[in-house]
Amino acid sequence: WPVGRIPDEKGKEAVFLLEQLRYLNNEYAVKVEAKSMRATSFLSSLLAGLAAFIQNRLRAVQKDVNLGCSAEVWKLPSSEVYAAIDKASALKLSPPTTPETLLDKQASKAKFAYFNLHGLKDAPEWYGQRDFRTQSRDPEYPIALTPSLFDNQNKAPELILSEACYGANILDKKADDAICMTFLATGTRAFVGSTCIAYGSVAKPLIAADLLAHDFWTHVQQGVSVGYALMRAKMTLARNMTANQGYLDGEDQKTILSFVLYGD
């Protein structure tokens, strides 16, 4: 079943958890009020229907702003994944992308964000990786993303999927020590990531976390809710790998088990 978790930071204080619950409560209250207004009168229903029609038309005309960043060495699979939500050519690579340049030309808060970067169990940053096939003099493992990049002025994307190892690891961490919790504290409504090592490929075809991410975004673009999109992506991964190789290997099993949803 689709399950979304509401994480909390370490310590005895519950401020981080309460802020998330308060935000969700407000969101639900707005939805309930909207439904109640639609049911009060014919005129209200008519106006609500007209507002929904206008909103849908505006969405059709206005293109959502999205964000994507991958380690340079994983450009090929990451580009195919990102193409599910935006132009593959818009995917940023690290190197050369750094925290100082990641949001360059980002006119507004991103709706969707996809990251395929390195993560460490005990480090708050995510890292890129130079493509070993190039002659570049860029750092081999540059910092690509830090928790301080997003705040109340620079809101985090609405929905994020990250393939970073330990991207969803929150054990014994404060909010500033885990990017996923920083995201949730600064505007992200749902975050999907791995609690441990994530597995992918440097080339095609897509496997493990790459395949999961591609199918997840495909379902989201079709209007499927985030929880069901993740559940269906896991089911598709299990079905395809079983059909292709007759079983689920260790990487497949860990991918299905380790990717979780935070938020709602």
Each language-model region and where it sits:
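Structural alpha-beta junctions
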Residues: W1, V61, Y82-P96, T182-S194, ...
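Structured catalytic cores of large enzymes
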Residues: W1-K87
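A short acidic, often aromatic-flanked loop/helix-cap motif at beta-alpha or helix-coil junctions
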Residues: E9-E13, T98-L102, Y199-G200
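Intrinsically disordered, low-complexity segments enriched in small/polar residues
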Residues: L21, N26, P139, Q245, ...
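Catalytic-core segments of thiol-dependent peptidases
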Residues: L46, L67-K173, D177
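A general structural signal for short secondary-structure junctions and capping/turn motifs
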Residues: R57-A60, L102-A107, L149-N154, C180-A185, ...
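Active-site-proximal C-terminal subdomain of hydrolase catalytic domains
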Residues: L159-D264
